[in-house]
Amino acid sequence: MNEQYKQLGVSDAVLTYGETILASLRERFDAIDAIAEANQLKVINAMQKNRVAANHFNLSTGYGYDDEGRDTLERVYADCFGAEAALVRPQITCGTHALALALGANLLPGDELLSPVGAPYDTLEEVIGIRESVGSLKEHGVSYRQVDLLPDGSFDLDGIRAAINEKTKLVTIQRSKGYATRPSFSVEQIGQLIAFCKRCKPDVICMVDNCYGEFTELTEPVNVGADMMVGSLIKNPGGGLAPTGGYICGRADLIERCARRLTAPGLGREVGANLGLLTSFYQGFFLAPTVVASAVKGAVFAAACYERLGFRVVPPAAETRHDIIQAVELGSREGMIAFCKGIQSAAPVDSYVTPEPSPMPGYDSDVIMAAGAFVQGSSIELSADGPTCPPYAVYFQGGLTWYHAKLGILMSLQKMQEAGLISL
């Protein structure tokens, strides 16, 4: 096997270093596998309960009336995640679209949106109206305020209490760190925050952006009081097979509003053809717990490898995981480029491409991205990216198989060593 690694460009020194790190992670990997097993059984139970059958994979076109496969998939999602209802559609194009849909469906002029966990993803700034944009919530009369986290990364409960007022209609909680170096939140932490917000205003809607977090723990935000939970099918729940799509699940009345926003009042969830994508949606969801476990193992391995070399990693290698993202602060633009070159060179697709920093809409700095994916933009497939500015953090995620994630990390070390940025 060592010879096969050498053929792919991994030196003996890097391979030996990687195996030394791996030997220290056996118990961690066993714990990750235990979570995957429990979540796999949860998915199977939801599929069996809803009597998933071969006819549920049939193509529908046009209006999509009476699409039993689509409707059954939504019941599977709802049951698996512990929600009253779910909307799972290829017409929801990405995570940002799903979030914009959930917000737009449940916020009216005069309402206020609150983020108690600081600034949202950059892509949501135009949705909200933090940056001026046509069609934003701000343009439609929805105000916004945020409460930043405390310096130690904990919730500013006094600030949140002061921010919640009679106009506060919806609280949005971003589970994952995004392009930040704060810790991602556990389901338990999210539950505590939701309970606090509900004590301040019992009728406030609590929505969780669950992107990158599905199946990393035994429970999901809906299980601890979230009224809505939102995510993308080209991330965790699509299992690497879904070619597009997003989901929203939670309270039935809120999900119905989302359905009517997605299509039209009077139509709601009754229309929306599946366009032949249901097999990939069902099979991807079935595989998702195992695929997510592979990605989590890759994140833990990356953290352990780079932490021992003296780099700051978020979360630390020994910390329990709440999403699939691993941030590594490499300290220089050159380090980010070398790391991403390693990830790209390990890809099954476009392995010959050399990633370079380049401008990207919505970002003040050039962004570098490495991804050789079967599905464009898929974050559950092995990838790495980040803005090339201090602290020069690269965000590593994904890996449909653990062995691919392992190769990616070894190749990142190889490129870092060849650039003279690390010594093994």
Predicted regions and their residues:
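Short loop-beta-helix segment that forms the pyridoxal 5′-phosphate
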Residues: 78-102
